[in-house]
Swiss-Prot record:
Disulfide bonds: none annotated. It holds the Pfam family Repressor_Mnt. The lineage of its organism: Viruses, Duplodnaviria, Heunggongvirae, Uroviricota, Caudoviricetes. This is Regulatory protein mnt. Keywords: DNA-binding, Repressor, Transcription, Transcription regulation. The gene is mnt. The keyword Transcription regulation applies. It comes from Salmonella phage P22. Mnt acts as a transcriptional repressor of genes ant and arc. Belongs to the p22 arc/mnt family. One of its GO terms (molecular function) is DNA binding. Binds DNA as a homotetramer. Gene3D superfamilies: Met repressor-like.
């Protein structure tokens, strides 16, 4: 990381700072480098999306559920007729 990279002030509880310091020492990094590594690792993993991103996604999900129910009901009716 270059000196001209953006700076960011970050407050954390003392116990978290101590854990970060211990982890950084164990990994042979500065606390800044360790914190950056933790953030990069977290951002590289896909995060689960909770809720709907917009109305179109919500509507698509509702329509999908309706279609599933229609297919299920149709198959159930067809099965009843064959037995």
């Amino acid at each position: 990381m270059a000196r001209d990279d953006p700076h960011f002030n970050f407050r954390m509880p003392m116990e978290v700072r101590e854990k970060l310091k211990f982890r950084a020492e164990a990994n042979g990094r500065s606390m800044n480098s360790e914190l950056l590594q933790i953030v990069q690792d977290a951002l590289s993993k896909p995060s689960p999306v909770t809720g709907y991103r917009n109305d179109a996604e919500r509507l698509a999900d509702e329509q999908s559920e309706l279609v599933k129910k229609m297919v299920f009901d149709t198959l159930k009716d067809l099965y009843k007729k064959t037995t």
